[in-house]
Amino acid sequence: MDLAKFNFEPSVITDFMQSAIIDIGDELQLCVEVGGNPDHPPLLLIMGLGSQLVFWPDSFVKGLIDAGFFVIRFDNRDIGLSSKIARPFPRFPINNVKMMLRMQVGLTNRHFPVAYNLFDMVEDTRRLLDKLALKNVYVVGASMGGMIAQILAAKYPKRVSTLGLMFTSNNKPFLPPTKPKQLQTLLSHPKTTQIDDVVAYGVWCMQRIGSPNHVDEREVERLIRLRFERSYHPRGALQHLQAILATGSIVKFDQKIKQPTIIIHGEKDGLVPSAHGRAIAKAIAHSEFHLIKDMGHDLAKPFIPTIVKLLADHYMKHA
């Protein structure tokens, strides 16, 4: 990949990465960071709901680079430094709880007037690969990013060589729902939009969804402040949630996936219980499932070396 073509400059947040704003068409721009040797196998990271690219821990990204990958990470639409979707609010507010309940029992939410769905976000990702002239990549998605990755692998099998899915779901009906303690994080918000309240809320959320006894509050606070300074856009997180709910079950896409697939899930994940990861493993032929003891819905520091090794070994086994 010719980095000079895209005006990449040293990242202001991670010293071993380079950053650029890339126009992918349809008046959309994505903030993209790359790191490692461009001649090495490309690995694309897709992050989850409302989470900027900074939420990929530096040690995780560096571990993948050291394992021999050229790593690409980006802000999804509506978050971070990527384009925001400024669609007018619908006349009647969307009932997110109603959408959650409908998806849980397999009812469609496609009639709800959401700003976009996961299929639109898949096209963002595919167009980014086109723009970067990356014909075939190892795709690793976390949470909502894992849902995007599943659809991408099924719709564009020639673009995805290998698939890594972390603490994600295929939203199959009647899977165990989000636990009440973690559900609060999806239905609440900071007291105000002042930075101290936003940071306190972010720490509160991670204490509930993260790995028990392994949440580094100081690091979480640093990341929340960084996210706030880059771009504070809570509507983007809301529209990400609605994109998931409007899309619904993606089991039919899992059944089309033929690429080697590894699924990694935390034993203590209350936001997306591990049964969701097992459901993906059951739906994707010849996939492998790994349950990480004591891990929640995050990439906590103690688990990063294990996860990096699992992802790297999986690629090498099928290269």
Model-derived segments and spans:
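Short beta-strand/loop motif that positions the catalytic acidic residue
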Residues: 257, 263-265, 269
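Conserved alpha/beta-hydrolase "acid-adjacent" motif
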Residues: 270-276
